[in-house]
Amino acid sequence: ALSGAPFDVKFISFDDIKVDPKVLDSIDVLINVGDGDTAHTGGKVWEDPEISSAVKGFVHRGGGLIGVGEPGGHQYQGRYLQLAAPLGVEKETGFALNYDKYNWDEHRDHFILADCPDHDVDFGEGKKNIFALEGTEILIQRDKEVQLAAHEYGQGRGVYISGLPYSFVNNRVL
């Protein structure tokens, strides 16, 4: 989706972050895209506290994080989405069924949706069973499943997108 867009794109591996966490200081936004427990989103690498704290610290200090699908998806220490704190969302895997989930108000007037017709987005297949954590702005939800959310984390911001097939509108969302 970024091909041809006016952005400098740099691919950073988890190994790059492990060797030198300051590699994140040279970028503005991190994007983590894919299904959980895959090489794309990291899988077991999120069990490494150096990786986890470097990424979360980057966002907390003012960086941006865009997560698509199941970003940081790996069941560990009571969480499935290891980037839940900065993104403000979590996947219901059966461990939080007894938690009250009252945060379902949509904020379709959010600036992220300003260029979208009818303030809507095509999420393709998207992901199921994603819920918002306290303090997260749900921009779009469908049947009590978060499709698009924004969450301030320290001085930075996380944005969760359930799916992002290529289109002009989705390019604008990014």
Model region roles, listed by residue range:
Residues 11-13, 66-69, 160-161:
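A structural signal for short, well-ordered beta-strand segments and their strand-loop junctions
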Residues 14-21, 50-53, 143-147:
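Alpha-helical scaffolding within the catalytic cores
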Residues 28-35, 66, 158-160:
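Structural motif
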Residues 92-172:
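Catalytic beta-strand/loop cores that center a nucleophilic Ser/Cys/Thr
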Residues 1-29:
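Aromatic-Pro/Gly-enriched surface loop or interdomain linker
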